[in-house]
Structures are given as C-alpha cells and as structure tokens.
Amino acid sequence: TLQKSGMTRSLKYLRQQTRRITGSYNGHIALRVAQDWSDYLDMAEKVGMNMQLESVMFPLDLKRRHDDLVLERNKRHRMEVMKGAKRSIEKEAEQLEKQFHIENIYKKIRKIYEYDGAEYIIRVPEGAKDILQESKFLDHCIQRGTRYFERISVRESYIFFLRKKSDPNTPWYTLEVEPGGTVRQKRSYNNDQYADLEDAKPFIEEWQQVVQGRMTASEISFAKQSKEIRAQEFAELKENGNIIRTGANAGKLLVDELMHDLMEVEKRVG
C-alpha cells in the first residue's frame, strides 16, 4: 500500500484515520488501522472497484467502507452456506418448537413489537425456524445451544430481527430484547457489530418508545421480572470476573461489554 500510494501520502492518511477513531494519534491504533486499510484495499480490488480513484484508495471513513465490504463478502458467503442447511434447520426447529413453543409465544406479542420506520424495520420471527436461519446466516451464537430459546419460553427475553427496509429479507442484526423493549444485545455477522449500526440506533430508540405505548399488563409484568434477572446476572458476572475468550473483545470483562451493549428504554414524557 505504501509503495503504490507513496510513503508520505499513505502515512498522512493513516494518521488522519487514526485521529478519526481516537481524537489523537496512537501508534497501537494506527497499526490496526493500517491492517484494516490493507484488508479494505484487497477486498475492493477483488470486487472490481476502480483502484485509480482517490475516493477508493483513500476513503473518507475507512472503517465504514471496510465494514461495508466485509458485510457484502459475508453475505455472499453465507448465502452459499445456507443452500445446504435447509433440512438440518427444519429438523432442529421442529424439536425446539416442541420443547419451547416459540411460535405460540410470538403470535401473542407480534402486534406489540413489529414496527416499520423510514429506513429500518423490526421483525418478529414466525418461530424457531426463522431464528435458526437468521443465526446460521449471520453465524452467531444463538444456534449453538438452547439458552436463548429457554429465555423466550419463560418470557425473560425475545429474539427479534433488525433489517434494512430496502432489503427486508436479508439478515442484518439480531436483537435480544427484554419484554418492554430494552435491548440486551445486537449482533451481526460473526457475532460482531459494525459501523453501520450507529445509523440505526436512533430508529431503535424510536421503536422502543412505540413499544411503550403498546404494552399490556402481562408484558409490563414480564418486563419487571426480566430487569431483575438481568441485574442479578450482571452482579454474578462481575463477582466472578468472567472474561471474554475469543473475538475482537477477547480479554475484556464480559459484564462490561454487556453493559456497554445494553440499550434501556427511556421513560416516556407526558
């Protein structure tokens, strides 16, 4: 990259992108930015982008452009993987429905939680099959066990889908949501989050307020119980000092990351 673009121009660009992330220059972060830039240029060339353009070689927001290409690459790969997974998903979903009755629960809550905004939508799955398909497409942790299905069955939390309105049938982010709308987790490809999530956060907050106006007495009761369970679990995680072992957050305290990811419902005014 340095040879192709010129040493001075490349170093200046790396400093600019590092400051964009941290507000100042940081050598450790600069190394990560350099790796992202290298990955981005490799992906851009493979998808046929014009590498002679300044805007391609030196994108204004490197992280955003890098993440966009990662998401597109992942989407193409997962579509191929899913072609051979249909039968196994159906078989597994059938067993999960017998055990946890996801379809029946979601029929009761669909009108409370489904919502269309100007650019994004929240979708309530039909049942376990939809959830498994979403998890296998995005390759995140829901598919690896029954924990989240158990939580749905006792109304501790639900699994919903955050989608782009322009592409409503393609998995984007999976949300773990408490009754009432508090979002515990937001996960996309490889159990991760990307720069594009920031654009959707105002919509999530808008949706949370809409949900508050639709709450039933039973859902309010479930929301209170869920909040108490979450507080207890966070306290236990903090006391035990559980560490994340893999991924971008490896080495960090699990409870800190869960608290950072949490989007609690703001109280309605008036």
List each language-model region with its residue ranges.
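Glycine-focused motif/segment detector
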Residues: 1-270
